[in-house]
């Protein structure tokens, strides 16, 4: 059985950035396993711009952004296998995978970086009544059809869900000549970035209906129309608010699910809120030497933040391999406690002796809060109290903690992160 220092599962933006980072931190024996026919992951179908402003200080399209990292991977001589499906990873970090060239094979890894990304929530998870006619697509499938395959999914479109992919596809379908009649969102707020609402809906005169959902789909062979209804505070349709829209296509942008079947199979502890692994300050899971980064850990807004997180995971995996897999003592872990409006934090625990000089704690809120404060309490003492005009679930928030700051509290047990009103 062949042994590698680091095996990276997934060749998308997270996997590529983690590989480059591990190589730059002194590890030569790296393998990327990617199930698609090319590296780059979802970026290959994201032909719009808006990528790279943080990482490269310039605006790039998705394929351009991926291309920068793919070039680095090739220049650094990092090995990768395409069209390769990882079937299983054991607790001892034996990776079982298969492809056409090698058949079914096993690899022993000293460290594993999970970078599988996420998948879209399908129609089946929504329980929409009606037949199953042609013309219902997830927004990402429609994006692939239009941008890569060169097929037009339909001419009259309704979009359910205001996640970033749905907003971007509203603009894309309009540019391709379709009529996007409405974007409906179940929640009383949009799930996407503010800039996407402005650039993709407002600029094209596409209406956004908040607190609305699809309650019926018309058509047997092909979608002929849908019925929208307003929902109450519990998400239940309000009788008498129904509106009919004729359309031949319904796109669903109703959330993303981190793809963690392999992680669960190997015994990684999961966070029920993010559907991703629980990680410490090194982005390491409960299994020593298994790290996670990118959308498999929690769903990000910007690929730049995925790359930043993956860079840290690559560096920490390299440090683990160099230390010959010696586990660090975890007795004095500080637990991060998200409450009062904060849904989760990544990481979930911090060991001060193990962390870099600064750590970024990322989190999402559970609703829209205006004129509020993002606060962090070190046990009972409020240390961070930052004014924010508005925070919303569609935009990831972050606070930065320094090692110097944490060392001033030697007995610190809990950091509580919450939203406070004036």
Q: What are the functions of these language-model segments?
A:
Residues 4-68, 72, 144, 148, ...:
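Beta1-alpha1 glycine-rich phosphate/pyrophosphate-binding loop at the start
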Residues 304, 312, 316-386:
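Mid-to-C-terminal Rossmann-like scaffold of FAD/NAD(P)H-dependent oxidoreductases
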Residues 362, 394-406:
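Exposed aromatic-hydrophobic patches
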């Amino acid at each position: 059985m062949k042994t590698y220092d680091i095996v990276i599962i997934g060749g998308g933006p997270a996997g590529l950035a983690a590989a480059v980072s591990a190589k730059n931190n002194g590890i030569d024996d790296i393998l990327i396993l990617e199930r698609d026919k090319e590296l780059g992951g979802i970026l290959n179908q994201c032909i719009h711009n808006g990528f790279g402003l943080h990482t490269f200080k310039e605006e790039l399209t998705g394929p351009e952004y991926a291309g920068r990292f793919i070039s680095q991977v090739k220049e650094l001589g990092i090995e990768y296998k395409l069209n390769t499906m990882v079937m299983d990873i054991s607790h001892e970090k034996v990776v079982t995978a298969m492809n056409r060239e090698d058949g079914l094979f096993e690899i022993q890894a000293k460290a594993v970086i999970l970078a599988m990304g996420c998948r879209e929530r399908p129609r089946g998870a929504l329980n929409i009544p009606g037949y199953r006619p042609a013309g219902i697509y997830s927004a990402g499938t429609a994006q692939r059809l239009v941008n890569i395959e060169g097929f037009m999914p339909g001419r009259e479109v309704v979009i359910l869900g205001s996640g970033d992919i749905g907003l971007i596809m509203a603009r894309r379908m309009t540019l391709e000549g379709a009529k996007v009649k409405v974007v409906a969102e179940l929640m009383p707020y949009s799930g996407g970035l503010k800039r996407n609402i402005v650039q993709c809906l407002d600029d094209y005169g596409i209406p956004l209906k908040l607190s609305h959902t699809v309650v019926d789909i018309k058509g047997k062979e092909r979608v002929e129309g849908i019925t929208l209804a307003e929902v109450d505070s519990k998400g239940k349709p309000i009788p008498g608010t129904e509106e009919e829209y004729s359309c031949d296509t319904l796109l669903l942008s109703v959330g993303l699910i981190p793809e963690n079947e392999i992680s669960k199979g190997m015994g990684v502890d999961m966070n029920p809120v993010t559907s991703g692994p629980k990680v410490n300050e090194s982005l390491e899971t409960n299994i020593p030497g298994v790290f996670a980064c990118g959308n498999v850990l929690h769903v990000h807004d910007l690929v730049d933040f995925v790359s930043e997180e993956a860079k840290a995971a690559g560096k920490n995996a390299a440090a683990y391999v160099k230390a010959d897999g010696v586990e660090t003592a975890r007795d004095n872990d500080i637990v991060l406690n998200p409450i009062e409006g904060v849904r989760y934090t990544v990481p979930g625990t911090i060991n001060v002796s193990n962390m870099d000089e600064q750590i970024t704690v990322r989190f999402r809120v559970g609703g829209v809060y205006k004129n509020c404060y993002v606060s962090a309490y070190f046990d009972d003492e409020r240390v961070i109290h930052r004014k924010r005009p508005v925070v919303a679930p569609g935009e990831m928030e972050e606070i930065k903690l320094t090692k110097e700051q944490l060392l001033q509290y030697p007995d610190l047990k809990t950091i509580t992160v919450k939203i406070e009103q004036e």
